[in-house]
Amino acid sequence: MKYILSIDQGTTSSRAIVFDKNANIKGIAQKEFTQIYPQPSWVEHDPTEIWGSQLGVITEALANSRILPNEVDAIGITNQRETTVIWEKNTGKPIYNAIVWQDRRTAKICDQLTKEGKDKIILEKTGLVLDSYFSGTKILWILDNVEGARQKAENGELCFGTIDTWLLWNLTQKKVHATDYSNASRTLLLNIKTLEWDDELLNILNIPKAILPELKESSTIYGKTDKSLFGAEIPIAGIAGDQFAATFGQACLKKGMAKNTYGTGCFLTVNIGKEPIINHERLLTSIAWGRKKSVTYVLEGSVFIGGAVIQWLRDGLEFFRKSSDAESLASSASDNGGVYFVPAFVGLGAPHWDSYARGTIIGITRGSTKAHITRAALESIAFQSFDILNTMKKSIPNFEIKELRVDGGASQNNLLMQFQADLLECKVVRPKITETTALGAAYLAGLASGYWQSAEEIVSLWQVDKIFEPSMPKNQKEKLLENWNRAIERSKSWIQNSHSL
């Protein structure tokens, strides 16, 4: 019997999951790695530690499932997007730490480019707003701040990659330097209409083309793992950025279907079909996947701090010992007690895009408790997701959401899911398998290798666990949203000089 191995390289941990033909999990392993904060609003990872942790969990997942490497039909890779690595082509050694998607150090560069009117060109070609969230300005920063980097880049001695590319390079032992369209569409460098690296964009960001990876479909054979790693050459047959893999894993394969992933951040995507809609409401248009010689586009809204707000209550304020305790604590309060929490720890994402916003807890009185603050934190995740979907309704012609498919760690929180259904006034549907990110990468790999035969087969494997129906009175919902909007306005533009970023 054969299996699919999914590599799921996330923001805080590296994971590996083994799936069988019915999408059942046969083995799983996970390892957290170091978060590096050199100064406020800077976030880095050690690429060598990422690779080491990923290699370790692959071996562990196979051992846990008692599956031999030669029983793996194919490997799929999914990854934290935008996070940027640059390494030496000859040695494979990174020239700087990976700059993580959450990192805000290049906000000033983005401000300057916006003053020059470059944001409009970038939006039309990439579907992205000009923000430090994306890879482009991170590459520029490394080339300009690491001694000798620019010269080496001009000489073709360096490789750039998002995390998928870095893992692929190491899995094939320097044989393959490539990425897929979904990850490339988050760099600020890919023209999402021509599906090519764009010379004008490279010129704007002063990035040499020589460092860029080859572009490929998301569901295709990239290469094979080097025999020295696992004792077998395993085909690497699928790659997609985490949110796009989750969209595929949720079987949102038809135009108009939507999913929200409640992870470190929240990422709401709507399948918009085969034609890009360039959005002027500050939502993002990206390529979700490429297969069978065409690409599928999504409209996405990104919330920077989703489940991470619960981690902060756990680790920063020590409100509880386990994240799973947040639900029972929040449920001990019948409502938020007038407390609103805007977790703008690293600024605000869609639809506000304010790098200068900061976190705020407002409405506190002597009667406010840990339970009220925890409930407000959970509610903030749903409020931010509501803001995105509300903006999407204005942006997509004739778009009416009937159900929202959900996944990610915080989707297990029933209080949060019910509140989300109440705000959106639509069904929130949680599937039986919530490991949809890893599953999406597995599906893409398995379709390329012939393990699964068709998209229809993928759709048939998707099963419902629980449906949350809206039940909140409309006037109560409207009052909550009114207060949330007041709280959001208080958090905006808090940082008054860019040195504090």
From Swiss-Prot:
Question: Which protein family is named in the record?
Answer: Belongs to the FGGY kinase family.
Family annotation (InterPro entries): ATPase_NBD, Carb_kinase_FGGY, Carb_kinase_FGGY_CS, FGGY_C, FGGY_N, Glycerol_kin
- The entry's glycerol-binding residues are R81, E82, Y133, D242, Q243
Notes on activation and inhibition: Inhibited by fructose 1,6-bisphosphate (FBP).
Q: What name has this protein been given in UniProt?
A: Glycerol kinase
Q: Could you say which EC number(s) this protein's record lists?
A: 2.7.1.30
The record ties this protein, via CDD domains, to: FGGY_EcGK_like
Keyword annotations:
ATP-binding, Glycerol metabolism, Kinase, Nucleotide-binding, Transferase
Which annotated residues bind ADP? T11, R15, T264, G307, G409, N413
BP-aspect Gene Ontology terms:
glycerol catabolic process; glycerol metabolic process; glycerol-3-phosphate metabolic process
